[in-house]
């Protein structure tokens, strides 16, 4: 088990550039499957879960390589639709690949995230939504076997505004004929970022950031270049660290509109927080 040793008592002061958001890049990496081409992702954080997602893509026959904080992905040569169990166990969010693989290949097979038995859990929202689009899913024995000769758009009301389910259904709906309307969708900035990437690659999606997302599916997607959203969680962590240590920090590339809840509390506590380009 790793250990962190912190020797406190010092002011935190200086300038830091905010990395790309992990919670944006993971679904976007899954979305590259839909493009069937070459994608360049800028400001991509080199984190364990990102590397795990790359290994999943490579297991499916895709290519990926780093140039600094730029990640190049080519999914043209994708040759598989099954995610190995060992890779599924590496991160719980790996289920996000299900919708994209199903939309591209018409079938997908993977184990339950984390390798545990399926039961009442947020993944049920993913499965019920995919079934609504026309997928046949056998989820016995802890393995998901999914088939869809044809996905068809329809209105889906999520029982809970799950980020993962919203993202998974957005990906699947890109490969569905007709219009899909996701109601009670998650409204996080990372949903908007996924919409931004998909639209850059030729999709037609509106409403991300609100509780209703509309996907007009059946459009051929293509590769492209996209810059990942700055990580609001990392930015908030630096702000709170500076506040607790009595320091002063400048956050480069942070999005002030995504930090309003944190900055409001810091101002109320007596901190001086300013923003702008």
PLM features: residue spans?
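Short, structured segments at the rim of ligand-binding sites
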Residues: 1-277
